[in-house]
């Protein structure tokens, strides 16, 4: 639990033993272990907070779909991206595509920046 947290609110982590096979599948084992050991917690309070009006309703969206993602099913990612009318790029990558395939992710960011000026 973090300092000053309301009662019943905790920090959540992915078990280090599971992290390599779900979040970091496809990455070198040493890198996956390092990422597991240094992961930042998710406050469980975030799981019950309203997010507000989705930005994709008013601004263009881009999505990088990791087709080897073991955290969020690629079909679900694709459905969400289509719902948001996003420009979609698929890459054979795990959940951490920004680490496994930084060139692809960077290119999508650059394209989005150029398109939105």
Residue ranges of model-derived segments:
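Short beta-strand/loop motif that positions the catalytic acidic residue
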Residues: 57, 62-65, 69
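Small/polar glycine-rich anion-binding or flexible loop at a beta-alpha turn
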Residues: 54, 95-98
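Helix-rich cap/lid subdomain of alpha/beta-hydrolase
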Residues: 1-52
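Conserved short-loop catalytic and cofactor-binding motifs
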Residues: 20-23, 65, 93
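Short, hydrophobic alpha-helical segments
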Residues: 109-117
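Conserved loop-alpha-helix segment in the C-terminal half of the alpha/beta-hydrolase fold
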Residues: 67-92, 99, 104, 111-112
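Short glycine/proline-enriched coil/turn segments at helix->beta-strand junctions
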Residues: 40, 58-59, 82-87
């Amino acid at each position: 639990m973090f300092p000053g947290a309301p009662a019943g609110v905790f920090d959540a982590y992915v078990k280090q033993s599971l992290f390599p096979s779900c979040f970091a599948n496809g990455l070198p084992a040493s890198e996956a272990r390092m990422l597991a050991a240094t992961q930042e917690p998710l406050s469980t309070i975030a799981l019950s907070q309203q997010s507000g009006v989705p930005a994709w309703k008013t601004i263009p969206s881009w999505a990088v779909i990791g087709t080897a993602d073991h955290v969020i099913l690629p079909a679900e990612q694709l459905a969400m991206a289509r719902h948001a009318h996003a420009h979609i790029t698929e890459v054979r990558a795990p959940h951490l595509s920004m680490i496994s395939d930084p060139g692809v992710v960077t290119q999508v960011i650059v394209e989005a920046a150029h398109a939105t000026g």
